[in-house]
Amino acid sequence: VIAEPERRLVLAYAPGAAAGQALSALWALDDKLAETVRTTSEPMLGQIRLQWWHDALVKLDGAPPPAEPVLEAVARDVLRDGVTGAAVGEIAQAWQALLQEELDAVTLKAFAQRGVRLFEIAGTLAGASPADPLALAGEGWALADLAGGLSDPREAAGARMIAEQALAEAAARRWSRNGRALGAMAHLARMDLAGVPFGSPRRTGRVLWHRLTGK
């Protein structure tokens, strides 16, 4: 999860208002799904609630959204340029992985699809280059976020290991101008893993350099 001031910074890098609105809508959806998992004590109930979100997103492909602000924003700002509700629904499916009893490598990879799909969809809507490492960055971003919230040291270490590798590969590439908001998210996640504190000038300076150079 990206803190609000850094969200505003990332949005400033989006290539136009429409791309920024799409990313904001995807963040709002991801926040809602995270809240669903966080406030669920019974895995079965959590699965039912996440499945509701998945099904509601899929239904947007054939019907207007219900009176729910997150779904309305997705329908208005995300479902264009070939992006479907079914594709967005895969983000909700990925969150279901956290309801498993044990977060092994397979489960972590399944959860990482949360970030992969979010980055790929946001990249499509921003006009990012096919060469931008969206999947790697999304995987690393999702698992870096997860690692910071896990209480089991072994599970946190597993998430961190996969995230570090994915983010290192994503950071080694030069991002297109239209992909740099997402590249900035990857760099911020990498600094989270490195323990660079929120609000540090190092964080702002790093993403500013990325905005200017794509690196």
List each language-model region with its residue ranges:
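Catalytic cores of Mg2+-dependent Asp-rich isoprenoid enzymes
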Residues: 1-52, 63-69, 73, 87-95, ...
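Short alpha-helix boundary/capping elements
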Residues: 57, 61-62, 82, 99, ...
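A short glycine/serine-rich beta->alpha loop
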Residues: 59, 104-105, 170-172
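Portal/gating segments that form or line small-molecule/metal binding sites
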Residues: 77-84
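Short, surface-exposed loop/turn motifs that are enriched in glycine and acidic residues
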Residues: 81, 104-111
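Acidic/His metal-coordination segments adjacent to aromatic residues that form catalytic metal sites
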Residues: 94-104
